Amino acid sequence: MRECLVFAAGLLAFNAVAGPVNLNQVFKLRVGAETVRFNPVEDGDLRRLDRQVQVLLSKPEGESKHTRRGLEEIERLTENALNRPTPADRKQLEIDLVETVLAVNNNARPPIPRHFDAIMTPLALLQLFRPIGIGQKPAANLQPGPTDDLSRRDPLPSSFWSLPPDIATENLHDGFGRPGLPRIADKLCRYAAPKETTGMNPGFEVDCGQERVKLKFGEVSSEPLVTRMFWALGFHADPTDYAAGVKVAYDRRIFTEFNSRQPVRTTFTVLWFIPVYSMNLQRSKDPFAYVAAAVLRDGRHWSGPELKRRLMTGTNFLPAVEAQIDYVVTTPANVQVKDPLVKSIGPWDYGQLDHANRREVRGAGLLAAWLGFYDTRFDNTKLRVVGPKKHPRLEHYFSDLGGGLGRTKGLLSWHGENVNAFPWTFTAPPLDLGKGRLARPLRIVGYTPDVRTPAFAAMTIDDARWMARLIGQLRSDQIIQALTASGYDPATIHLYTQKLISRRNKMIADLGLAGEFPPLTLE
């Protein structure tokens, strides 16, 4: 089922185009049935945009909280741009405004086409071509510096990435600059809200003391590992941890709201309007399958299947049985403690605006390839407002990094969290056509993202070497720290460590950096 999803999602990514930001053009803000056209460099257009956004915000809340938050940010940015800032500040406000508008638009963008017609078959076949590292043009956002080796130049400061102060000294067990792991296992949490996104993996939110925590029953170990690596190398990623089980006070809504995820539907047609077949790719899950134990008030324990058998009569709950249950313990989950100062607006896309011309977004392709992270659909990213309301800033997050550490190449055969399927290498030496000329200096051969990813395709040898120098600073014990915190057993930790080191060493050699970074060994 997931293969159908990513194949269809690729059709939406097909038309993404890379290029520099041209702000002197008409953009469209789409909210429900409303479309607002504006040119961000024209004050008259900004005033009109501001008025229309105020009208949208004055209506009863019919839009999602993310869209409404985006409209509030558009209002703030527009008014600041009209308040006579310096030319440099005005340009940044215009860029932030357009980024926010596109993120709001992306909220209404379906993860797959709402219908697939036979006439789209050639386009679908083109989706099978998902290149990485075939770029020729240098990144457009490099800091000033020598031109003899562009791979040594960092990108200009941005909302996507910041230079890590000292990669080799980071504690990747706790990760994310924290003094320790969250102590969720020690708390009795209370059910708070269902998961209502389009994600395939079930989950829900709980309140654990003063913290709101997201539980996700899928990619329980790969996501904590991959997020730690992205964060360590300077990207914005949600602090994600492995939990062997979470104690949640009994609440009927755990079961009645478990399948609240949004449907993901597509209709197959011929001649564009004759329906042939409809499919909902969002499958319902049995909530009792994610209960490891139910703990009764008298101290007895029931398994998930036993709880279901005793608690339910058909689709009806038995109140007398409910009264006996103190709390449930979930199966392993990946958990994210929500930061009240980090709020989502909507997804950003690897191919929108100048994203594919940015060194840091291109370089993320090599990091993704090393870790086998393949799920690069646009809805696995988020543009977020960070900080207090009086001084907010925008940051681009890699928000769902779970698809990795498994089978990393194929037409429709990716599979994460599979140590035996995870290859030992993913690069090859430069291809020499003779006479001292290198036809293909960058060859990534063991990795393919699941959708066309323009920024990864645009990656050049210089972008790859830039990222490889960051990866090369990681120590083997840091890899072990991250794997241990991610809940893997000792044998799996050992094999993953060997493979990640092997992939790292081969990558360093194939990119011509062996003189800078000696081979890493398993300490």
Question: PLM features: what roles do these ranges have?
Answer:
Residues 4-15:
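Bacterial N-terminal signal peptides
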Residues 17-191, 208-210, 473-523:
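Regulatory N- and C-terminal appendages and interdomain linkers associated
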Residues 27, 99-114, 388-523:
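C-terminal catalytic region of ATP-dependent kinase domains
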Residues 38, 211-219, 252-255, 349-356, ...:
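Second-shell loop/turn segments in exported
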Residues 41, 66, 198, 218-222, ...:
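Extracytoplasmic/periplasmic, Sec-exported soluble proteins
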Residues 175-335:
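Conserved ATP-binding subdomain of kinase catalytic cores across diverse folds
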Residues 220-223, 228, 337-419:
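Conserved kinase catalytic-core segment
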